[in-house]
Amino acid sequence: MYFTRDPVIETVITSREGYKLSVRNTKHFSQDPFMVEAIEVISLGNICFFRNCDHSKPFLVPAGDYEVMEVRDTKINLKAVGLDRGVKIAGGREALIKLTKSTPLPVIDEKPLADSPEEGTEPTSPSKKEKKEARKDSFKGEKWKEKKKLSRRRNHKEIAEVTGASQEILDTVKEELWEESQENEIVEQKKFSLLPPPAKLISEVISQTVVDPVVTSADLNESLQALVRESSDLINALLSADDAIHFPETEEEPTSASFEESSAMFFPETSSATEEE
């Protein structure tokens, strides 16, 4: 860090051998402390700060919020041991031969020999136990294998039953679908048989029914003329009859002329046709 005015170094705190200085925050104990070997106490105006003497790890903290403690260093200084490469074995082969000659022969006691058969019997017991354990293990293994086989057979049977049931269900569903399809085909055939296609088109029928208006008017004129003739014939026949027909005074006798006039009023076309004749 650079300052416009260098601070005043009040004092320098250093640790003893095997110790270090721990600068810890008194307000926040969760913060890790600074472990250093020496600290400078500097002042900027009326405020004091702790500054690390080691410039590779600099820090500047207020002295009022931090405390300095001397803690034993956990590091162990190991000294390097130098290896002496010029070590030689004294005597060489001759020393080894002398050692073999000077060594006394071992004395065999009788007691250990007497105790040897007892010791020999002891290993037999573990062998029997091992055999029994091996038999038990084999028996357990056989039982386990049999159980496994039985479980496999049961699983195969259950799978076969399930597949058989599913196959039956599929067969029944297929049969029902086939029957429904057959019924639908029969119904469709009946519908087609009940409703045969028309022999003529609708346009042809309409064209046949349409008649010229001139022809219809001529037919109507002819029919009206025929009715007028028939009515006039009937009136003449009634007038020419021997029996006189007496009508009331209020009523007037109808004449052929009046009937013709009335018909002409109601049917002008017929009257014009009669005049032309």
Swiss-Prot record:
Map out region (Disordered) in residue numbers.
Answer: 107-157, 245-277
Which domain of life does this protein belong to? Bacteria
For this protein, the record's InterPro entries field holds: GrgA_tf
Where do Low complexity bias regions lie? 256-267
Please note every region of biased composition (Basic and acidic residues): 127-145
Q: Where is the composition biased (Basic residues)?
A: 146-156
Family according to the record: Belongs to the chlamydial CPn_0623/CT_504/TC_0791 family.
Put simply, this protein is called Uncharacterized protein CPn_0623/CP_0124/CPj0623/CpB0649
The scientific name of the source species is Chlamydia pneumoniae
